[in-house]
Curated annotation (Swiss-Prot):
Organism placement in taxonomy: Bacteria, Pseudomonadati, Pseudomonadota, Gammaproteobacteria, Chromatiales
Lineage top rank: taxon: Bacteria
Catalysis performed (reactions): an N-acyl-L-alpha-aminoacyl-tRNA + H2O = an N-acyl-L-amino acid + a tRNA + H(+)
Subunit structure, interactors included: Monomer.
Residues flagged as site, Stabilizes the basic form of H active site to accept a proton: D96
Site entry (Discriminates between blocked and unblocked aminoacyl-tRNA), positions: N13
An example molecular function term from Gene Ontology annotations: peptidyl-tRNA hydrolase activity
Catalytic residues, chain numbering: H23 (proton acceptor)
Keyword tRNA-binding: yes
Listed name of the protein: Peptidyl-tRNA hydrolase
One GO cellular component, as annotated: cytoplasm
Compartments it resides in: Cytoplasm
Documented EC number(s): 3.1.1.29
Primary localization: cytoplasm
Amino acid sequence: MATTTWLLIGLGNPGTEYAQTRHNAGFWWLDAFASELGINFKPGAKFFGDYARANWRGHDLWLLKPATFMNRSGQAVLALLNYYQIPLEHLLIAHDDLDLPPGVAKLKRAGGHGGHNGLRDIINRLGRRDFLRLRLGVGHPGSGQDVVSYVLNRPSREDRQAIEAAIGAGLEVLPEVLAGEMEKAMHRLHSQS
């Protein structure tokens, strides 16, 4: 089996003040995967973020947590994609999603940004929107005016546990995603919700 190279991105904001906020659910997912692999992130100035590399189940994986703050995430994504010439078909972005309740994870093949500033910047910089996303539900505050405050605050203990369960579910289907078995991965993941 030929080795494929993938770029796995977790979206979030850098810094300890944001580490436990809902907006960092993408970071949490990537951290959980790195922990499972027993690897550590290191700073990479040319990639505008913290990265790690692993060979896992026949795949050459780059893991990246942009250090550019959410609204400039595309800078980091583009830098690593271009440097290693990773095809867009092998890009997976994990991010928080207000439209899903805590505990729900969904895969999506393409689409708009849905108001997510990290996705908005990535789409603008790539000039395309046809990349894989792992949407990690964090719930919605109920009012659009409260969204910024909501995503930049910590979830309740119950919500955090639910988000962690969704992170685990997202990791469980990663082998199928990397093998190109998206229908199987989506069916497994979406039937858990």
